[in-house]
Amino acid sequence: PTDYPFTPPKVTYMTNDGMTRFNPNLYKCGKVCVSILNTWSGEKWSSCQTINSILLTLCSLLNEAPLENEPGQTKYSKDFISYQKSIEFKNIDFSICDMLLKYTIPQQFQMFYPIMKEYFINNYDKLLTYVQSKSNEISTQHVGIYSMTTNINYSNLENKLIKTKTFIESEK
């Protein structure tokens, strides 16, 4: 904004398929809901905060149990397991494969594509082993709190992961 640092910057979440709520603080529409951006209750933005403080706050959201970021939700909540399974699957399906297959990578983030490819190649064997370990898992997960449904099929995801690697290698 023109009056930065007296007003917080506007932050938009871009790894978004429009259907999956990847984190309670990261909305399907791209809204980032945290107090220091004045988009949630709590400690508000002050001019002594920086882009670095925003990035640190956002990093703190990226944890192994993101539903616990939602007030009143715990690992014992009714949607906890369904949400975990949905996010685990969609992080590989959408956030990795679809982005690398260039189905959904926003134009303004194309500059990060080489870094994404390198990370994928360096971690491909681990990803493939993980997906193969779940190859018999086929389910439909309903997450009531977000009216979210995810069709999970790790066997299909294994094929997509292989396709992604083939695509990346063909670009060399």
Each model region followed by its residue ranges:
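Compact alpha/beta protein-protein interaction domains typified by the UBC
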Residues: 1-78, 98-101, 114-125, 129-131, ...
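Charge-rich (especially acidic), low-complexity segments
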Residues: 68-172
